[in-house]
Amino acid sequence: MPNTTKKRRAGLHRGFPDNPEQFARAFVTGRLAGFTKDMRICLRGIRKRVNNRWVLTHAYFPALMSCCGMLEYLTGLYVGRTNGLGRREVTAYAIKYLPQPDYNADVIRILFDAFRNALAHRGIASGVWVDRHHATRGRRLTWKVFANATRPPIEVCVNEDVLKIDPPWPCRYTHRVHIRLGRLWLDIRNSANGYMADVVACQDLQKQFFQCMEELYPR
């Protein structure tokens, strides 16, 4: 049976059937509410026993996947499509709406090439990613994920060592990427507020927003 109470509360087309600007704002606000719920659940923390002591842990990789997904979703609304989105489009959104240089082109490249794609296909927990970019001389990156909200959200640190526990042989790395999920979450959320202000004021962005709606909700 349909949830008529929820329908009444939301209203037809989020309460703005004849106001595309306010519909866009209400739509993005609704997506942000879901994103915030997911992130709060992931970062709430549970206690687990490690080496005879209790430590607080979190759902780090579901949280990271949620951040990447929301960033791509906002990018799709910004550029007018969800199909065929790539790093170039995400970088354009990031440069426009996310703090710089925290989310410059190289940071977005690492976030998506090393983490987003691996999470989508393999649900990574540990490993070493070899950076094939011509400027990095084949640096070998591993990672550590935190729940806190300090800056920078993504930081590449020189840290030469060897992974010994998970791999079947010693696996060398030269750098460690620190990912701070609380900061990533807050920055993406704040970027959406900036995007919403622009889409209400700019007809070109409204056009691209509704082009994306055509893909998400085909007539």
Segments (PLM) and residue ranges:
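Polar/charged alpha-helical tracts
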Residues: E21-R25, T29, K207, Q211
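Long, acidic, intrinsically disordered low-complexity segments
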Residues: M1-A26
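Acidic, Ser/Thr/Gly/Pro-rich intrinsically disordered interaction regions
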Residues: Q100-R219
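A generic alpha-helix propensity feature with a strong bias for hydrophobic helices
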Residues: T5, P20-F23, M65, E155-V156, ...
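A near-ubiquitous, low-amplitude feature marking generic local secondary-structure context
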Residues: D18, Q22, R53-T57, P99, ...
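Short, contiguous, well-structured surface segments enriched in hydrophobic/aromatic residues
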Residues: A26, G30-K96
